[in-house]
């Protein structure tokens, strides 16, 4: 029924309350996964439910072709907190990583036509898009999609000497997870 992108666990969650998930048998679980570490907001907090409901009653989705107040407020808060002058909203970590790769390559090209190499770590995971697969250091994800985007180099995680050996004037970026989750919780 669903595309098999994960080995699923035999549990069917039907409800969440705070840090607790409840399955279809009524068993309760502490949610230590948090949406694969992307949702630390808990489940069904009354203020969150109220905010989502209020937004859904106003505008559920508007293309980025147009302005809308909720997006403007979120952008202002992000800019104030970071000190940056621009923000780009994405739907996923893969999209954010795609943008980072594009920014790095564009900036590198401005400095030198050959400054387009991206170093990434073995056992890393950065997404399932074409660009992020090229910097995801796991053969099981890459194999079916070769040839991948060129000029990416895999480095052993935590091997500083290997990193130094491959870091040269052609490198425009290094993408890494401080703690590898998909790669086996390596730090």
Question: What is each of the regions a protein language model found here?
Answer:
Residues 30-33, 122, 173-180:
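Short beta-strands and strand-loop turn motifs
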Residues 23-24:
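Short, acidic, Ser/Thr-enriched surface-loop or helix-capping motifs
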Residues 179-187:
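Active-site core of PLP-dependent enzymes with the aminotransferase class I/II
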Residues 76-173:
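PLP-dependent aspartate aminotransferase-fold enzymes
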Residues 1-17, 34, 167:
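Active-site-adjacent loop/helix segments that line or gate small-molecule/cofactor pockets in enzymes
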Residues 28-113:
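Glycine-rich loop-to-alpha-helix module at the N-terminal edge of alpha/beta enzyme cores
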Residues 27-28, 185:
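Residue-level signal for well-ordered, solvent-exposed loop/turn and beta-edge residues enriched
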